């Protein structure tokens, strides 16, 4: 019942949140699977955090109350800690991982951990920064420089001829070094500012050699008017592209144009707005494709109208049961001016969760009904789907259930999916592939990341220290590898298929 869908928040005597017990805990009082747990030190600083189904994370602060060490469950298995080193102004200058003992890490609270910038290519990863706290086997992921451009002559930067700044950058980030997780390389970058502390030029090395340069011009209000991107490869060959932005009197974006090298400029998109500031029209590709948007009095989107596709969304009107809470009661769409309308009527439970999507065609959705219905047969108290039925095309002229799924969980983590449907989608259409029948078909690591999906024949998923997937391995020997920088930006994808690799 609604009355029993309770979530409990428990605080200590100082008002700090120490437990969050969601509705699932009321029926299954397992703190490890369901509870959010927080602990604090005598200064009310968070020192322990545990999320449901995950190993706890530890946080350590120095005498200046700054986070200097943290450790999650996966790092604990490898006896690693993340470290953060600050300058005298409290800005992070070095981040990475180290192998300090737990006992040694705890002593950081007795001192102020500072990073001092030294002359020459010394210190952590030859960055010039020296930590006042001893770090065991440090692996540096991020280095930040501030205020000046003296770093240009340091190790790594000198190979790219970064220019000197002409405007004072006091108080701003001027340069950085980011490691590339999955390789031994580094990315070197520098930012240059105008007198209003806005970045007007940004230079960055590339993992495969060469440089990327972004030059930005601003309006008086601070909105970018143009961005010139110059890509130079390792041989010195350059390509340029320029994005130009136009705004109306309310600083709303109205036009975006793109120019590649010396080719004619192309209008990518043009926006118009109504009297209430809502997006009214989009025109793409020099105005060839236009899309109009309609809203109701509550500013809810009610219609999309274009030359190739149109859609209507209904909340309190239309063919479904009226919904006054923002849920869509029904929707219809057409792919082309003369196409037959198709659509769904939606039903929800008393908590606003979708239970049924009934398909139909024609103005009243009364033709070819139920062909592509979807039905959620149940939810648990955490809002997880327990059962799902999907209908679809099963033969050239027939339609039936293609998925009859039963989902099992361990806490909030999906454990098993069983498909009781005896039919398959026609012509290799989309459906769930029940690849295996085991008590546990999905596995997770200490941080809650998925490590196996046996229904998709994924035997292992490896993650980097940012909890981003670095490699996905399949039972047939195929794999996908990802390369990221230390900021989490994906730089490269390598697909290995039957021994052949494709890099993008």
Give the residues covered by each predicted segment:
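C-type cytochrome heme c attachment motif
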Residues: 16-19, 36
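Alpha-helical repeat/alpha-solenoid scaffolds of the HEAT/ARM/MIF4G superfamily
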Residues: 102-141, 147, 154
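Short, small-residue-biased leader/transition segments that mark boundaries at the very start
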Residues: 3-10
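Hydrophobic or amphipathic alpha-helical targeting/insertion segments
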Residues: 67-122, 482, 489-493, 500-503
């Amino acid at each position: 019942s609604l009355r029993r869908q309770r979530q409990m928040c428990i605080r200590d005597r100082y008002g700090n949140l120490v437990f969050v017990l969601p509705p699932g805990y009321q029926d299954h009082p397992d703190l490890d699977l369901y509870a959010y747990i927080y602990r604090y030190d005598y200064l009310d600083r968070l020192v322990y955090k545990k999320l449901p189904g995950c190993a706890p994370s530890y946080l350590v602060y120095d005498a200046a109350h700054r986070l200097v060490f943290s450790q999650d469950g996966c790092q604990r298995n490898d006896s690693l800690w993340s470290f953060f080193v600050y300058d005298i102004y409290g800005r992070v200058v070095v981040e990475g991982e180290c192998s300090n003992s737990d006992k040694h890490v705890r002593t950081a609270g007795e001192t102020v951990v500072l990073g001092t910038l030294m002359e020459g290519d010394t210190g952590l990863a030859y960055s010039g920064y020296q930590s006042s706290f001893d770090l065991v086997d440090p692996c540096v992921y991020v280095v930040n420089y501030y205020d000046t451009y003296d770093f240009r002559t340091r190790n790594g930067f000198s190979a790219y001829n970064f220019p000197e700044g002409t405007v004072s950058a006091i108080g701003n980030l001027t340069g950085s070094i980011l490691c590339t997780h999955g390789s031994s390389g580094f990315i070197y970058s520098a930012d240059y500012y105008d007198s209003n502390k806005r970045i007007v030029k940004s230079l960055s090395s590339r993992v495969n050699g060469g440089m990327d340069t972004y030059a930005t011009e601003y309006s008086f209000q601070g909105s970018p008017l143009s961005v010139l991107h110059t890509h130079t490869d390792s041989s010195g060959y350059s390509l340029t592209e320029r994005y130009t932005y136009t705004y109306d009197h309310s600083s709303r974006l109205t036009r975006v144009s793109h120019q590649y090298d010396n080719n004619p400029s192309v209008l990518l998109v043009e926006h118009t707005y109504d009297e209430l500031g809502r997006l009214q029209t989009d025109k793409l590709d020099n105005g060839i494709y236009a899309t109009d948007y309609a809203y109701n009095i509550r500013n809810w989107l009610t219609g999309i109208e274009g030359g190739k596709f149109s859609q209507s969304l209904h909340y309190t009107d239309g063919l479904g049961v009226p919904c006054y809470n923002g849920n869509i009661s029904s929707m219809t769409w057409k792919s082309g001016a003369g196409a037959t309308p198709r659509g769904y009527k939606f039903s929800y439970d008393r908590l606003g969760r979708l239970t049924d999507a009934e398909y139909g065609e024609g103005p009243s959705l009364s033709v070819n009904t139920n062909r592509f219905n979807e039905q959620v047969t149940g939810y648990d108290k955490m809002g997880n789907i327990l059962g799902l039925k999907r209908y679809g095309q099963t033969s050239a002229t027939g339609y039936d259930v293609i998925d009859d799924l039963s989902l099992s969980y361990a806490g909030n983590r999906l454990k098993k999916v069983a498909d009781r449907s005896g039919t398959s989608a026609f012509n290799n259409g989309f459906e769930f592939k029940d690849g295996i029948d085991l008590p546990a078909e999905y596995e997770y690591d200490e941080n809650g990341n998925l490590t196996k999906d046996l229904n998709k024949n994924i035997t292992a998923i490896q993650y980097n220290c940012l909890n981003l997937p670095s490699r996905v391995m399949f039972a047939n020997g195929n794999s996908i590898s990802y390369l990221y920088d230390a900021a989490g930006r994906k730089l490269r994808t390598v697909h290995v298929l039957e021994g052949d690799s494709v890099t993008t």
